[in-house]
Structure formats: structure tokens, C-alpha cells
């Protein structure tokens, strides 16, 4: 099957799981639930879920387990975007062509919606049925995710990003910001699948880390390019000056070259993985 069709299948599947999970919660008519749903279904590409299901195919992880992991990761991702957009953070009024959660539902409700999605993610990972996943594996998965989004991961990335607004930043510093802010959640998504499998090898884990981090950074640069193009046509470019991005620091052409380099890294990682295990061909 062509990967595009597989991607669409994965995207449809996780959207159904997210919809079902949120609809099972109490207080469906509350502004909190409405804000949570609004943010989760605001046009996400579900890239992290696609990586989860694809990695699960490689390591023969039960689809039910992959559903649990994908749901948890997508809720974490949505929570992070809600908080990123808040006036005290990036102060963005739009997200994926729609008004941000805090503009539609207010800051206090948006803050709570992000908090609720984060706690829901861990509740799902803690309590949902995952075939052949022992309690020891489950604890390892929870530990991995909590580490990757806290002060040693995503939250630190956001903090570094906020601090960077006050000074000049070089390419190396920008890569560190995006490593923590974006790539660590991507890495965690792939790691959770591997930790839930019946395999474990430090060498394979290192390959998976290289692959997922490279994909995460490439995705961030592409996002920066798209934002740069959109913001460049606007008369008010204060945000462009305020935020440090790849196009601003190294230019559009070098940013595109950087994406190609990262794609090459990710493919080399997959080739290394092929030498150790059998990988499905799409």
C-alpha cells in the first residue's frame, strides 16, 4: 500500500479514537470540554500518530496498544499548542487558520483545557488496556513521556524559546530550542511504541532516536518556512522579528537544504534499522 493511503488510514483511525475518548467524558456541555475538543480537532496533521502506527508495524505491536499511545501523544501535543498560543507565551491569535483556543474560549478556560488534556493523556496511558504490556513496561512508558515533556524536555524548550526573544540566537542555539520543544515529543512517541514491544536493544533505540529527532527537526523547519512566507506578506511583521526561526537566521535556501540533510539522516537511520530487523515496505 502507498504510504499516503496508509497515512490517511492512520489519520482517520486516530481521529475516531480521539473523538470517542473525548465524548466519553462528563460535562459535555461545559466550556472546558468544548475548548478541549476545539483544540484537538483544529486541523492537526497527526504526524506523531502516523509515526506511532508505522513504528508499531515494524515491531509488531498490537493495534490496541498503538491506539492508546497515539491518543495520549495527541492529547499532549494539543495541550502544548493551547499553552504555546497563550498571551503569556507566544501570544498567537491564530492556529492552523482558525482562531486560537484562548481567543475563542478565554485565557482561563484555555489554560484549564491544556491542563485537562495533559492529565487525560496520563490517565489513558495508566489505565487503558494494552495487550501484552506488563505493568513494568507501562511504568517505563509513563516515565518516558513525563520526562520528555517536563523541565528536561518540551517545557524547557518553550522556556528557552521565550528567553531567546530577549537576545540574538545562533543556529546551534536554535537547534537546541527545537530539539527540546519539538523533537523530544516526536522521539517519545516512537520510544513508547518500542518500549511496549517485545524487543529491546540500546543500539536499536539509538537508531530510532536519530530517526525521530531528525524527522522532528525537519518538520519544525518546514513549519518555520510556511510561517515565514505567510507572515512576510503581512504589513505588521513584529512577530517575525520577535521569534527566532530558521529562515530568519540562515535564510530560506539554507533552511531547505537543512531539511534535505535531516531527511537524509532519517533515511540513513532506517537503512541501519533494516540491517537489524525486517521493515515492511509500503
Swiss-Prot record:
Q: Which gene encodes it?
A: ispA
| Chain segments annotated as transmembrane | none
UniProt key word Metal-binding: yes
In Swiss-Prot or TrEMBL terms, this protein is called Farnesyl diphosphate synthase
The entry's Mg(2+) 2-binding residues are 84, 90
Similarity comment: Belongs to the FPP/GGPP synthase family.
Q: Does the keyword Thylakoid apply?
A: no
Reaction catalysed by this enzyme: isopentenyl diphosphate + (2E)-geranyl diphosphate = (2E,6E)-farnesyl diphosphate + diphosphate
Q: What is its main location?
A: cytoplasm
Which EC main class describes this enzyme?
Answer: transferase
Give the residues the record marks as binding Mg(2+) 1.
Answer: 84, 90
Q: Which CDD domains match?
A: Trans_IPPS_HT
Q: Which GO terms describe its molecular function?
A: (2E,6E)-farnesyl diphosphate synthase activity; metal ion binding
Query: How cofactor binds (record note)?
Result: Binds 2 Mg(2+) ions per subunit.
Q: Which coenzymes or cofactors are required?
A: Mg(2+)
Pfam families documented for this protein: polyprenyl_synt
Which keywords does the record carry? Cytoplasm, Isoprene biosynthesis, Magnesium, Metal-binding, Transferase
Family annotation (InterPro entries): Isoprenoid_synthase_dom_sf, Polyprenyl_synt, Polyprenyl_synt_CS
Give its E.C. classification number.
2.5.1.10
Q: Which GO terms describe its biological process?
A: isoprenoid biosynthetic process
Annotated residues that bind (2E)-geranyl diphosphate are located at 95, 181-182, 220
Tell where it localizes: Cytoplasm
Q: Which domain of life is it from?
A: Bacteria
**Its GO CC terms?**
cytoplasm
Species for this entry: Buchnera aphidicola subsp. Acyrthosiphon pisum (strain APS) (Acyrthosiphon pisum symbiotic bacterium)
